[in-house]
């Protein structure tokens, strides 16, 4: 990637809006910028990151900066979890009147005993100095602030985080 492309991606990724009310946000640019910013981390593991956004996906009602923080945390965690030459898949599509974003990886999975605690503040499975244990707590809070929900499904060899967000009202009319 050229330097100008990386700078552009970082600017898009760090878009910390100061909006006081939720507004229509397109999901695809935020996901694309997040993946561009994390591309070098993926390269270090020879990991592949794929993205598949449904054509004509409506905008969601939310806060762009917060949504980008959500994508950054989920995709970064997925890259931490995958083995060498692992795979992280990101999809976004419309389901049941909402936009659903999935971040899936082929890492070892999250044991059930740990899964119950992953959204707890200060809970981490990472080595000392490698994480604060706040990432998924913050993700859950930001998703709630954007009127969304998050679920995790994990088994050995696969973990999926599923984020549902409301479609912007004017996007609903445009469909």
Regions found by a protein language model. Name each.
Residues 48-58, 95-96:
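Conserved catalytic submotifs in the C-terminal HATPase_c
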Residues 77-79:
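Short helix-loop "hinge" at the ATP-lid/N-box region of the Bergerat-fold HATPase_c
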Residues 85-97:
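Short beta-strand/loop element within the Bergerat-fold HATPase_c
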Residues 98, 110-122:
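Short conserved segment of the HATPase_c
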Residues 105:
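Acidic ATP/Mg2+-coordinating residue in the GHKL
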Residues 135, 139:
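Short alpha-helical Gxxx[C/S/T] motif in the catalytic ATP-binding
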Residues 142-144:
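Detector for a conserved hydrophobic position within an alpha-helical segment of the HATPase_c
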Residues 147-148:
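Conserved glycine-rich
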